[in-house]
Regions:
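A short alpha-helical cap/connector motif
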Residues: 1-132, 139-156
């Protein structure tokens, strides 16, 4: 049970949420067993919300800052336009293997572009207009988002 959420709220969410897809359950389990700081993983409930929002928006160009093990990117990919792409950035090179593994297994691997390094250096090289930006790493990116992403939809964790 999640120690940060009120039990009544958690019970309500559990009763009224979509089930976590099997692949995401596998990724969740592997992250918790093998990766340092698994609490950084997006919860299954947050993932379902990201999926629903993505399905409503049907984004073509997505920017995610903070890939971690790829859970949230896979949730967003569920609603991605058939010709859409997710640019996901993480500074931790050690996580690329687990990200790749699950991106390939998902069927969205060709629509998810991984970038390893400092987002402030990578974003200008991508040179895209994003219609969905998910800031999952550092709240400091809010300033960037407000300044450079007119017209985007933001999900800020």
């Amino acid at each position: 049970m999640n120690e940060f959420i009120n039990k009544d709220i958690l019970n309500y969410v559990e009763l009224n949420s979509q089930q976590e897809p099997t692949l995401l359950k596998e990724l969740n389990k592997e992250t918790n067993l093998k990766i340092l700081n698994p609490r950084m993983l997006c919860s299954s409930y947050q993932g379902r919300v990201l999926s629903i929002i993505s399905k409503i928006i049907r984004p073509k160009n997505v920017l995610e800052i903070g890939t971690y093990t790829g859970y949230s990117a896979l949730c967003i990919a569920e609603g991605l336009d058939k010709n859409g792409i997710i640019h996901t950035i993480d500074i931790n090179e050690e996580l690329k293997e687990i990200q790749n593994k699950y991106f390939k297994k998902s069927g969205f691997g060709n629509q998810i572009q991984q970038h390893i390094g400092n987002a402030i250096e990578i974003i200008p090289k991508i040179n895209e207009c994003f219609d969905f930006v998910y800031l999952d790493a550092c709240i400091c990116w809010i300033t960037w988002g407000i300044t450079w992403s007119y017209g985007c939809k933001f999900i800020i964790k």
